[in-house]
């Protein structure tokens, strides 16, 4: 084990504001848990747990290198968990694992059975299409087997399947192969049996051979016809129509709203809601749940002897079957496409990957099928799935993880918010480790306990949401769980917490002036793009300015001033730390900023001695052979050491001056032989002796870090910020950029706004009474003698901030009087710049969709606002149409 001491490459606080690497040092990779054991080893198998996190590690197992005994042990453990997952999902309608975890376990079993055929048997969970049926409904044999689909999770796997189909059919790659692409509905599979055009039975998929008879419930679904439409000669004697029962997003939201109004627990997602509704013992309950159905397959089809030759539609392929269904009045997904190349398949995947939140139901992938039914028969099937179809699964938007803790966070206006601390989990393209719980009432409503397995969703938005607990995972763990208790005092300053007024759900810290957490958040706000836009003044540097002792250790037992990292070998534990005799904690620092008032008077000299606390990481180093055959060392961060040291926040670590070339020696300089930057401060001198025996004095200096210099330059530019940006920077409650811009435009000067009344502000279009009262309350308080707000205004005005006239937009007012909502992400605009573009052209950039909305701009990963616009019939625009709207005020 090696403890790395401080050196001249000491890390600055800036490294935490801007974590980009220049590639000059080895990457440090986070890891935990089973990672210290070899995947597939005896110890690894024994340590494996039925958690989602451990399920995702199964993909790392090299099955080919395992012994038969180890493979059998792993198969037995994983098979038991898969079977439990199937029962929970298909029978109990109460899944305990995320879809991603279930898929990973199933893939592991399939790999083991392929490598060790003795593990494969008809009883394996891999051959079971769904769960075995429960005893609540009569079991009925399907007239023809109802199969599931194999899943793939990458484009490479999809390409392998596609090439396998071409090989299986001996199909030339240059010849178009007709296929269908369909969105994979996240619902429940259903087999509808019609005899002579009359609905006879509705069966769940069950295990694919036998399903549950839920006919009475099926008859309550309004989109499923009781009788097939069309002339008698086009109605078959017998047909099985396969499809999916699901709940539309709008119906799901209505159902949950009704549940909450009635004091019932809301459903976690539409799939669970549909499952619970379809398998109700009382069909009258199912009838109230607004279920929907789309057909996506065909089973047995017999036209019967009574049909004259060619008197009915011949069904040769999948797409023809869908056209026939439409004639019969059976709904088919409007999102289906016919394709003839792999590129067109990828186009479909890309399109719905970007528009997952835009359609009427939840989806988790794209299903690709060979269109020709004759070719389907040629390709055949495995024991559980057809070879002529595949399901490409998108990264999950909803996963399970562990709720490690609930902490509280103090915002810039004093609002104290519970924050869920999660075991890091990958969801919808990024790793999530924290998410807001809004207020203590929301924690109570969701019913989560610290230690719970919880569902995390990130659908249609960049902000993750904690949906609720997985109640099945509480069994046997009740003693490990605890309730969240909202603190009664501010964790930052100790002030007593309370609602701002009676009836408020939000709890606030009243110590607005002196609470370090509130000041830090206000500094972060004023530096943001929506206010002064001060680059390089990020979260960590704001903390360094306002609360540099935030992570100060409680005692010398965890103070290690000379240890910046601890290096261990694989499997090695760090040695216990013993502080040296006589070690004392450094004196407490006084923050550079105690108020926003001092921001524009900051100099680099003020920042010279600011230091912040950093925890020394534990770094595991192991050797591996690179692609060039050479041995290289790989660094992996395996956790924090619990030992803390200080680093300079804004100035560099001590640096030895670079020696000048002989021709560049400057005899007029204080150190003729060395280069010392003009802004450097020499902190010591060292005697250097050359090989020839001559000596020189080498200075060692510190200087403002490059990002510090840039930050101060940006602060200087911010003195001339637009008036509306100054208003946002003041952190007035409820006042955001759009309303700040409107007020600045209406009054013209900061002095006029300071003395405006509630009535005067309320008369401005788009300014409600609550915003008007917030503005007047803030400036009224600022006029009181000794009030910190007044001190901020006076200091900023003295620095030249906010003293100019509001600049009118020189752009044509193409959107005057119009309301535009932007949802999702756009390529050419950030969310704020899109709203700014609307406001600069006279429009209102609203945050929600209503009947008063004129247009909704829909970008990538748009959420419920797009669905709301569709429901209200409001025109929806893509990015190109949005640009046209900005230029002309109309869209062709």
From Swiss-Prot:
It comes from Bifidobacterium adolescentis (strain ATCC 15703 / DSM 20083 / NCTC 11814 / E194a). The keyword NAD applies. This is DNA ligase. NAD(+) binds at residues 99-103, 148-149, 182, 205, 244, 369, 393. Its EC number is 6.5.1.2. SMART domains: BRCT (SM00292), LIGANc (SM00532). GO terms for molecular function: DNA ligase (NAD+) activity; metal ion binding. DNA ligase that catalyzes the formation of phosphodiester linkages between 5'-phosphoryl and 3'-hydroxyl groups in double-stranded DNA using NAD as a coenzyme and as the energy source for the reaction. It is essential for DNA replication and repair of damaged DNA. Its cofactor is Mg(2+); Mn(2+). GO terms for cellular component: cytosol. Residues 810-892 form the BRCT domain.
């Amino acid at each position: 084990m090696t403890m790395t001491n401080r050196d001249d490459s000491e890390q600055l606080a800036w490294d935490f504001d801007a974590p980009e690497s220049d590639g000059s040092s080895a990457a440090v990779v986070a890891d935990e848990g089973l990672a210290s054991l070899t995947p597939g080893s005896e110890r690894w198998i024994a340590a494996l747990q039925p958690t989602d996190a451990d399920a995702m590690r199964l993909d790392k197992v090299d099955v080919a290198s395992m012994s038969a005994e180890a493979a059998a042990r792993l198969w037995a453990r994983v098979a038991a968990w898969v079977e439990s997952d199937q029962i929970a999902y298909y029978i109990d309608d109460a899944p305990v694992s995320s879809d991603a975890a279930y898929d990973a376990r199933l893939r592991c079993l399939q790999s083991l059975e392929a490598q060790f055929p003795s593990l494969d048997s008809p009883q394996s969970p891999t051959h079971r299409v769904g769960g075995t049926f429960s005893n609540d409904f009569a079991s009925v044999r399907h007239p023809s087997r109802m199969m599931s689909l194999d899943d793939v999770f990458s484009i490479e796997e999809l390409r392998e399947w596609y090439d396998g189909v071409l090989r299986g059919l001996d199909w030339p790659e240059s010849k178009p192969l007709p296929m269908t692409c369909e969105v994979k509905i996240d619902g429940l599979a259903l087999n509808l049996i019609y005899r002579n055009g009359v609905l006879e039975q509705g069966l769940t998929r069950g295990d694919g051979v036998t399903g549950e008879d839920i006919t009475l419930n099926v008859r309550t679904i309004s989109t499923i016809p009781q009788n097939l439409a069309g002339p008698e000669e086009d109605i078959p004697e017998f047909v099985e129509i396969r499809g999916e029962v699901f709940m539309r997003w709008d119906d799901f939201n209505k159902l949950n709203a009704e549940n909450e109004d009635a004091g019932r627990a809301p459903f976690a997602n539409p799939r669970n809601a549909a499952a619970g509704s379809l398998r109700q013992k009382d069909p009258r309950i199912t009838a109230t749940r607004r279920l929907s159905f789309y057909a996506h397959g065909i089973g047995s089809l017999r036209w019967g002897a009574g049909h004259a030759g060619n008197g009915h539609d011949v069904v040769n392929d999948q797409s023809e079957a869908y056209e026939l269904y439409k004639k019969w009045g059976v709904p088919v997904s409007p999102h289906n496409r016919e394709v003839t190349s792999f590129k067109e398949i990828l186009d479909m995947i890309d399109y719905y990957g970007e528009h997952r939140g835009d359609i009427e139901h939840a989806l988790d992938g794209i299903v690709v099928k060979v269109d020709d039914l004759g070719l389907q028969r040629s390709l055949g099937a495995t024991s559980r799935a057809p070879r002529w179809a595949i399901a490409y699964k998108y990264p999950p938007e909803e996963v399970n993880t562990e709720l490690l803790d609930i902490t509280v966070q103090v915002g810039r206006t004093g609002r104290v918010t519970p924050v869920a601390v999660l075991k890091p989990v990958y969801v919808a393209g990024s790793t999530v480790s924290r998410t807001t719980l809004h207020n203590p009432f929301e924690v109570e409503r969701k019913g989560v306990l610290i230690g719970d397995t919880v569902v995390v969703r990130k659908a249609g938005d960049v902000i993750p949401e904690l949906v609720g607990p997985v109640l099945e995972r509480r069994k046997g763990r009740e003693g490990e769980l605890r309730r969240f208790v909202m603190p009664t005092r501010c964790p930052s300053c100790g002030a007593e917490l309370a609602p701002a007024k009676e009836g408020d759900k939000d709890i606030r810290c009243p110590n607005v002036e002196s609470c370090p957490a509130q000041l830090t958040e206000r500094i972060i706000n004023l530096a943001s793009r929506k206010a002064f836009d001060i680059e390089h003044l990020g979260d960590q540097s704001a903390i360094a300015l306002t609360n540099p002792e935030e992570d100060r250790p409680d005692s010398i037992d965890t103070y290690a001033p000379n240890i910046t990292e601890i290096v261990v070998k694989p499997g090695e534990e760090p040695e216990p730390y013993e502080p040296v005799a006589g070690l004392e904690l450094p004196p407490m620092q006084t923050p550079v900023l105690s108020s926003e008032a001092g921001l524009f008077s900051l100099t680099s000299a003020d920042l010279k001695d600011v230091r912040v606390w950093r925890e020394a990481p534990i770094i595991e180093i192991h050797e591996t052979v690179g692609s060039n055959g050479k041995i290289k060392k790989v660094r992996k961060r395996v956790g924090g050491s619990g030992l803390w040291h200080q680093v300079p926040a804004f100035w560099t670590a001590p640096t030895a001056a670079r020696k000048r070339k002989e021709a560049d020696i400057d005899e007029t300089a204080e150190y003729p032989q060395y280069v010392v930057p003009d802004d450097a401060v020499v902190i010591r001198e060292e005697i250097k002796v050359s090989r020839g025996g001559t000596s020189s004095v080498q200075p060692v200096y510190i200087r403002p870090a490059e990002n510090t210099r840039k930050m101060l330059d940006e602060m200087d530019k911010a003195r001339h910020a637009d008036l509306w940006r100054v208003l946002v920077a003041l952190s007035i409650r409820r006042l955001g950029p759009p309303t700040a811009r409107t007020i600045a435009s209406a009054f013209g000067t900061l002095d006029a706004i300071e003395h405006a009344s509630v009535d005067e502000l309320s008369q401005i279009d788009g300014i409600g009474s609550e915003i008007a009262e917030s503005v007047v309350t803030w400036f009224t308080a600022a006029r009181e003698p000794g009030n910190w707000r007044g001190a901020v205004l006076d200091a900023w005005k003295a620095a030249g901030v906010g003293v100019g006239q509001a600049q009118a937009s020189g752009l044509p007012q193409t959107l005057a009087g119009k309301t535009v909502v932007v949802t999702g992400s756009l390529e050419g605009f950030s969310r704020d710049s899109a709203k700014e573009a609307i406001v600069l052209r006279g429009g209102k950039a609203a945050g929600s969709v209503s009947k008063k909305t004129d247009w909704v701009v829909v970008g990538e990963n748009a959420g419920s606002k797009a669905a709301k616009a569709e429901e209200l019939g409001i025109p929806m625009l893509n990015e190109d149409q949005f640009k046209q709207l900005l230029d002309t005020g109309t869209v062709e």
